[in-house]
Amino acid sequence: MALLQVFNCELQQTDFQKYLFLANQEFTLSKEHYGFLPYNYGPFSFQAYADIRRLSNLGLLSIGKAVKLEYKTDYLSCLKNIDRAALEGVYAQYREVKGKSLIKEVYSKYPYFAQNSKIRAQILNEKIKLPSLEISQSLFSIGYEGRTIDQYLNTLIGENVSVLIDVRKNPISMKYGFSKGTLFNATKNLGIKYIHLPELGIESSKRHNLDTFSDYSRLFDEYEEEVLVRTKKTLEEIVELFNRGHRLALTCFERDKQFCHRSRITNHIEKEIGCTTRHL
């Protein structure tokens, strides 16, 4: 909202994302407020987009082609000095650069964020060097604990993951971006296939009283003996996806794979495919 205030209370949606990106990329901030990933029109923050919608629902913003402040409140005065200086720096340096000119500026400076753009050929006359991505079949695992949706998706993009396999029993999260519907749509728009395999999850009722590593080990031993034994067909389907050349990532909540049942799944799959899992 302070960014909108700096730009006279109104910005086109694409410009808003680009200016916010530049504030994070080129100026010193008190912390990383938003992460960005390469999307349809360059750097994009799902979290920032969600925040805009939330503020619109509260009546503080209006959203159309442009994002507009509804009230002339001094949001800048609420910021730390370093953050206020960053936003004012973006305005001073880029206020005359808008629309396609702003997109071209960002694409030229930060080609990583242009790799998924639908309009890259229209914006840039010259070719830019895009990051080279691994294409060989691989197996990964990733937890979203401690990650924003943008950081999480950026990790998948960086590893060129083609299939994301959700092994949660109940794919619902209070954390924005990680409930099934939102995660499905986000990955789909990035060209990543999302598959939910609830049969590989653990019932919530069995996750009580897990206080020590030994508690988790006992739970996962039981999981192997009961669940993995009766889901051999599902595990074979994962192996088949790998054999087709996909770069697979198994996902759940816990960041540390030792405290997540996906480590037992990957252990089983490793024996079948002769490949070591990279835990992201």
Located regions from the model:
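Short, acidic/polar
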Residues: E145-L156
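Short, surface-exposed acidic-centric catalytic microdomains
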Residues: M174-Y216
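Short, basic/glycine-rich phosphate-binding loops at helix/coil junctions
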Residues: L130-E134, L210-D221
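Short Gly/Thr/Asp-enriched flexible loops that form oxyanion-binding sites at enzyme active sites
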Residues: S179, F259-E270
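A short beta-strand-loop structural module common to alpha/beta enzyme folds
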Residues: Y19, V163-I172, H196-P198, H279-L280
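Internal catalytic-core helix/loop-beta-alpha segment
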Residues: S214-A249
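Domain-edge interaction signal
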Residues: M1-E145, K271-C275
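Acidic beta-strand-to-loop metal/phosphate-binding motif
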Residues: V163-N170, R247-R255
